[in-house]
Amino acid sequence: MVLMIVSGRSGSGKSVALRALEDMGFYCVDNLPVVLLPQLASTLADRNISAAVSIDVRNMPESPEVFEHAMTQLPDSFSPQLLFLDADRNTLIRRYSDTRRLHPLSTKNLSLESAIDEESDLLEPLRSRADLIIDTSEMSVHELAEMLRTRLLGKRERELTMVFESFGFKHGIPIDADYVFDVRFLPNPHWDPKLRPMTGLDKPVISFLDRHTEVHNFIYQTRSYLELWLPMLETNNRSYLTVAIGCTGGKHRSVYVAEQLADYFRARGKNVQSRHRTLEKRK
C-alpha cells in the first residue's frame, strides 16, 4: 500500500491533486499533522487502503527530524511517497489575484510576494526529499489530474519510472527535471521549409535526423551515461527519474531524441513514460 504525502507551495494545486488521488481510490486527508501519520496508516493497514495526505506550511513540523521520525513509525505494509507540487512565482501571484484568497502566511503581515518566498524556504526540506516534483505553471486543473493518473496508475510498485520529456529552451527549463540535456547543437529541421510545420514524431523529420551521425552519437552517449548510473539510482529509493531533453522550440530535435531514448529503455524492460511539453501546449 502507498502513503502518498502531497506537499507544495500554496496555489500550486494540492487540492486538485488530492481530489484526483481520491478518484483513484486513495483515502485522502487534508492537512493532517505529521505526528498523526503513523496512526492513520495503522488504522488503514487492516483495510488494505492506500492513503494520501496533504502537508503544507500550516502543518509543517518544527524540524525535519519530526518528519523523518514519523516515516520510521509507519507500518511495514505502507510505502511512503512524497509528491511536491510547485509553480513559478508569477503564476502563483496570478492565481492568488484571480481567486482573491489570502495566502496562509499573510497573517504575519507579509506581502503576497514575501509570503510566497518565505513559504518556499519553509517547504524546502520536503521539496528536497520529494520522489516526484511537478511544475503546474502551464497546467490546467484537468491536465494535472490526468498527469497524476498517468504517472501513478502507470507505475509498477517499487520500480523506478523513467520519464523522458522534451521541451523548448525559449519556454524555460522544466523544474521537475533530474537531468537536462541540451540538443540545440544538432542539425535543425526547422530550416527546411517542408519540415518546419512537422514535429519530431513525423516520419520525414525522423528520417532527416536519422541521417546525421552526430545525432546517433549523442543518443548513444546519453543512454550510456544513464545506463551507467541507473543501477545506483534504482537502489536510491526513488520512484521517478525525469530526463529533460531541450532544443530551441521543443518541436523537432528534443522530441525525436526523447522518443529514441524512451524506446531504448522501454525495450529493455524499464518502466518508461514520455512527454512533450511544447506539443502538449499546441493541443
UniProtKB/Swiss-Prot annotation:
Coiled coil: none annotated. InterPro entries: P-loop_NTPase, RapZ-like, RapZ-like_N, RapZ_C. Keywords: ATP-binding, GTP-binding, Nucleotide-binding, RNA-binding. SUPFAM superfamilies: P-loop containing nucleoside triphosphate hydrolases. ATP binds at G8, R9, S10, G11, S12, G13, K14, S15. GTP binds at D56, V57, R58, N59. GO terms for molecular function: ATP binding; GTP binding; RNA binding. It holds the Pfam family PapZ_C. Residues 266-283 are annotated as: RNA-binding. It comes from the Bacteria. PANTHER family: RNASE ADAPTER PROTEIN RAPZ. Belongs to the RapZ-like family. RapZ subfamily. Homotrimer. Modulates the synthesis of GlmS, by affecting the processing and stability of the regulatory small RNA GlmZ. When glucosamine-6-phosphate (GlcN6P) concentrations are high in the cell, RapZ binds GlmZ and targets it to cleavage by RNase E. Consequently, GlmZ is inactivated and unable to activate GlmS synthesis. Under low GlcN6P concentrations, RapZ is sequestered and inactivated by an other regulatory small RNA, GlmY, preventing GlmZ degradation and leading to synthesis of GlmS. HAMAP family: RapZ_like (MF_00636). This is RNase adapter protein RapZ.
